[in-house]
A protein has these predicted regions:
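Terminal low-complexity tails and localization/encapsulation signals of metabolic enzymes
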Residues: 1-46, 50-53, 57-73, 83-84, ...
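Rossmann-like NAD(P) dinucleotide-binding subdomain of oxidoreductase/dehydrogenase enzymes
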Residues: 86, 90-93, 112-248
Length: 248
């Protein structure tokens, strides 16, 4: 059991294998997460913009070493991540295990690919600034880790806003990075509701880039509110599939 203590509004997480609410008296919450307010969100964005730890000025070699440590932490904590995904999201061990492997691959891949890009002397590589990562509920390990790792590898400060259904799992992922030495000011975990706080976050003028996976309608709303932001959106689609006589 893990708890983030605060006077703020809390979101409780119960064992998904148990009957739905109302639960029997005395059934404990698996996690209790304090939710960020609109004021908290604004403060987080300011910290990300100010970059007090000077993450943007670190070298790729320094970032690569720290990210390698984060990947190692994720390897060591595979069981904890699988357990949290089951306890909070109801994901089976069979589903979570390969997702963790994919997350580790992401962390290892991005700094390595940047090293290859650095070999092109005609390119000038520089961070974009503040990156907001908003992943979905159904792949709560691999997709957020990929966005966070890519942004950090490039020297950006990151605001990581997990799905409301996976806040505790997002915290466990963030710990893998923090415990490797990546500053909490460079990677901030923002757990907020989908109302005014998240609108403030995604619409904030100091957020330079948004990495979003979710509904097409939501992505279009983000683009409408912040047309000047760099938006990398992976959304749902209704692509046609054509089966010809050549298929088995």
């Amino acid at each position: 059991k893990s708890e983030i203590k605060s006077k703020r509004k809390k979101q409780l997480f119960f064992d998904p294998s148990q009957p739905k609410m109302p639960l029997a008296p005395g059934v404990p919450a698996v996690y209790s997460v304090a939710l960020a307010t609109k004021t908290d969100v604004k403060k987080a964005v300011k910290i990300a913009k100010d970059d007090p730890e000077q993450w943007r000025h670190t070298t790729l070699s320094e970032r690569h070493e720290l990210l390698s440590g984060a990947a190692l932490n994720m390897r060591k904590r595979r069981g904890d991540l699988i357990g949290t995904a089951a306890a909070v999201c109801g994901k089976t061990f069979y589903e979570s295990d390969p997702e963790i492997s994919e997350a580790i691959d992401f962390i290892e891949y991005y700094p390595h690919s940047l090293r290859l890009m650095e070999q092109h002397t005609s390119l000038k590589l520089s961070p974009l600034g503040v990156v907001l990562v908003i992943p979905p509920w159904n792949f709560p390990i691999a997709i957020p880790t990929g966005g966070v790792a890519a942004a950090l590898a490039c020297g950006n400060t990151v605001l990581f806003k997990p799905s409301p259904l996976a806040f505790p799992l997002g915290a466990e992922i963030a710990k893998c990075f923090w415990d490797a030495g990546i500053p909490r000011e460079a990677l901030q975990l923002v757990c907020c509701e989908d109302g005014e706080p998240i609108q403030t976050l995604s619409g904030h003028p100091d957020v330079d880039t948004i990495i979003f996976t979710g509904g097409t309608h939501t992505a279009l709303k983000m683009l409408e509110k912040r047309p000047d932001a760099e938006l990398s959106a992976e959304t749902g689609g209704k692509n046609a599939t054509i089966v010809t006589a050549m298929a088995d």
